[in-house]
Every structure is written in C-alpha cells, then in structure tokens.
Amino acid sequence: MKRILATTVAALLATTGLALAPSAGAAECPSGNFCVWQEANFGGQRANWSGDDGWWESWISDTDSSWANHGISGPGIKDHVRVYENAWQGGGMTICLAPGQEVGYSGAANDRGDSHIWATGC
C-alpha cells in the first residue's frame, strides 16, 4: 500500500510541475522556476513551479517565507512573478519578484501567499 501511495504521489507531482525538497539555499532553485520555501533564508520545504499556479497546495499555502525567481528572461517573456494572498490571484499582491531576484524574508509577504502568475512586470 505504501509503495502504491508513493508512486501515486510521485506521478502527481511530476504532472503538476510541483517538487518538494529540503533546501539549503536559493541556489537550489532550478533554472526556469519560481521557488518558495517555508522558512526564512531558503530553509525548510521548497515548492517550485515553471508556470502559473492558481491554488497552491495546502502545505505551502500561507506558509511561504522566502522566494526566488530563476525564470527565463528575454524580450516579451513573462519573467516576473507576482504572488497573491488568495487563490486564483485574488486579494492583494504580497510580493513581486524581478528576474533573478531572491528574497530571504519579507515581513510584509511572510506566510501570505496562496497563488502566483508569471507576468511581464510588477
């Protein structure tokens, strides 16, 4: 039963583009991804996405404490990341990251993120 559950979870994570990993730093955020950690200074569990997500999974929703934008940048590319306090980009924007920006902690954005989109600017 445990093997079936583990296989199912792995398949689900692979299809949604979400990855879980303990992280020691922002450098571990894969190229082309936006990453969020549960702890300040890129500690604890990490979630990463290469696309938009209108409804973060419950373990990371409202527990985000550090962020890194390692997205691809270029003319006309949506390379900024806007994080919102409610699902489906509802409520206010809690933080916006420019290409390459890494934020180890923000009191204004801490534990408030529920969704994000890639955009052409903040």
Predicted regions located by residue number:
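Compact beta-sheet-dominated domain cores in extracellular/mature segments
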Residues: 2-9, 14-17, 22-122
